[in-house]
Regions:
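Hydrophobic alpha-helical bundle signature of multipass membrane enzymes
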Residues: 20-194, 216-222, 226, 232-408, ...
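Non-cytosolic beta-sheet module surface loops
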Residues: 478-481, 512
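Residue-level detector of functionally pivotal "anchor" positions at catalytic/ligand-binding pockets or at interdomain
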Residues: 452-473, 480-481, 532-535
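Sec-dependent N-terminal signal peptides
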Residues: 4-13
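Short, glycine-anchored, charge-dense loop/turn motifs used at functional sites
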Residues: 336, 490-497, 518
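Short, surface-exposed loop/turn motifs with a glycine/proline- and acidic-biased composition
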Residues: 498-528, 533-535
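Short beta-strand/loop motifs in extracellular/secreted proteins, especially
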Residues: 483-488, 516
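Sec/Tat signal peptide C-region and signal peptidase I cleavage site
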Residues: 15-19
Length: 535
């Protein structure tokens, strides 16, 4: 019963129709979002080998402050929806504002409000000291409130969470300009290192938190409705969409892989040696198990997270959905591998791996990016859209899957991070594909049915009224006299299925509707959730 109530609270509270300015309302509350303090590891301590990359990047950022790039970073420190809109207006070539493009502005504004909650709990948990405070200097962002920052945790970066969330959302809305948008979003996070407000690992963590935020948003009927409206508004400016828009090109978005001449190579080497120390532990055994990357392997891993069985017999729709996503992620990872060759750690350092039988075959394949990590993180994000009751466990497993490749000696840490970013924007590009939408809808409904979430009244019902399900009918009964109002029934994608003016006891039929999730509201409040399991 606890999982049922949590599922309802987390998955379906997105239908909020209260009379207020929706531009300022997040799509989900913080307790309905993944918690980065659970699925991500703690930030590196200053005594950790992993701090080497943070320190090197701090030095690099400091060297950039007196350059035009440093001026850009300082200007970007303003923390507002208007500044974010201005940044992406410049990138996309038209004005995004509340007056000029109200639908796109709403999407950005509400996305930002939600993204802020993606990192808040982790910030409070770790309260990491920021670079400028640790190094006894002043922050270089013109709009940064230094005193506020001193009392606000550095890990993960809030600015980066907002910037990368916005980039992912706008790239989904406008795939015609996805490379430019995503590159701009990547630079926005880099700016926080330059001004000394964040360590590199804060920024890396925030990009992952942002990707979980956008994955979570896909389950919100309000988000999908706002996305559709923003897309329509965008096409009025852009014109007819091209027939075929491919996937984002990572070569245009992320920097080239780190080579041995780069100062950042020392961070990769440090991470390699630290991970290598885990090989003779249970974590090393897990890394060997994680070498397998078939769909069936991921279904088994996610089954453990969910405490239920997922396979092609029990969950054919979920299997079909993950199989489709798996193929797309793998193809995009291969496309990047074929264009960027990097030697694997065990080849570069000559120190062997955890899986020696694969070394000869894999030695001529690029280390960058990690396909295993692309699949592990991408499929975990894909599952978030289905399983709001188990988000953190699935995301933690997806993250660990990538780290297993560092432990095994098959990938550098930076290969894994690049793979996770590739996975996120590839997955959200798929949201525009009709086949993907068909598969994810079927998978979402199948998961709800497997969990047994069927016809659950919501506790926050209007006073003096009782709600129940009788067969294919939603029945509203007033217990303290007649009430009037509007009873709406929505599909999970936000479409109004039934609209009834209520005066007294009412019964609304769901007969004839396909298998799916339906949400009833009375005068704007969610009153009933029905997972229809019969036709």
């Amino acid at each position: 019963m606890k999982k049922v109530l949590f599922f309802l609270a987390v998955c379906l509270m997105g239908v909020r129709l209260a009379a207020q300015d929706l531009d300022t309302v997040p799509y989900y509350d913080d307790n309905q979002m993944p918690d980065a303090g659970i699925y991500l590891p703690a930030p590196p301590d200053t005594s950790s080998m992993l701090f080497i990359d943070d320190f090197q990047q701090w030095l690099w950022g400091k060297s950039m402050r007196s350059t035009p790039r440093g001026q850009q970073a300082s200007w970007e420190s303003e923390y507002s929806v208007e500044r974010m809109c201005q940044i992406y207006s410049d990138a996309m070539g038209f004005v995004i504002s509340k007056d000029a493009t109200p639908a796109i502005y709403r999407l950005v504004s509400r996305g930002q409000k939600t993204a802020a909650q993606a990192v808040d709990r982790a910030k409070a948990r770790y309260m990491r000291i920021r670079p400028f405070a640790r190094m006894n200097e002043h922050v270089a962002g013109a709009f940064d409130d230094e005193e506020h920052l001193r009392g606000n945790g550095s890990y993960p970066s809030g600015h980066t969470s907002l910037g990368w969330t916005t980039a992912l959302i706008l790239a989904q809305m406008a795939p015609e300009q996805q490379d430019t948008i995503l590159r701009r979003g990547w630079e926005y996070g880099e700016s926080r290192v330059i001004v000394g407000a964040h360590w590199q690992s804060d920024v890396d963590a925030a990009r992952l938190a942002a990707s979980t935020c956008v994955a979570r948003l896909q389950a919100s009927p309000e988000f999908r409705s706002d996305m559709a409206a923003a897309r329509t508004e965008y096409l009025l400016w852009h014109g007819a969409a091209p027939a075929n828009v491919g996937f984002p090109n990572t070569r245009h978005i992320l920097p080239a892989p780190i080579d041995t001449a780069s100062y950042r190579y020392y961070g990769d080497v440090a991470a390699h040696w630290l991970a290598k120390s885990l090989r003779n532990t249970p974590r090393g055994i897990q890394a060997v198990t994680d070498h397998s990357k078939y769909v069936e392997d991921f279904l088994s891993q996610f089954s453990d997270c969910l405490d239920m069985t997922l396979d092609s017999t029990v969950a054919p729709n979920i299997t079909a959905y993950l199989t489709y996503v798996h193929a797309k992620l793998r193809a995009e990872s291969r496309r990047l591998k074929n264009s960027r060759f990097r030697r694997r750690p065990y080849v570069q350092l000559g120190d062997g791996s955890l899986i020696p039988e694969e070394e000869e075959e894999e030695s001529t394949d690029s280390s960058y990016p990690s396909t295993h990590s692309t699949l592990g993180w991408g499929l975990a994000l894909a599952m978030v859209e289905l399983t709001p009751d188990s988000m953190n466990a699935i995301l933690q497993r997806g993250f660990e899957y990538g780290y297993s490749r560092v432990i095994a000696g098959y990938h550098w840490a930076s290969d894994v991070q690049a793979a996770r970013l590739l996975a996120s924007y590839t997955l959200f590009r798929l949201q525009r594909e009709p086949e993907f939408q068909t598969l994810v809808a079927a998978a979402r409904n199948e998961y709800a049915a497997l969990r047994g979430y069927a016809g659950i009244p919501v506790a926050d019902a209007a006073s003096g009224a009782a709600f129940a399900r009788a067969g294919d009918n939603i029945v509203l009964t007033f217990t303290d006299g007649q009430q009037t109002g509007v009873l709406n029934v929505y599909s999970i994608d936000g479409r109004v299925i039934r609209n009834v003016n209520v005066s007294g006891n009412t019964s609304v039929s769901l007969a004839g509707l396909p298998h799916g999730t339906y949400i009833a509201t009375f005068n704007g409040r969610i009153i009933f959730v029905s997972f229809k399991t019969t036709f």
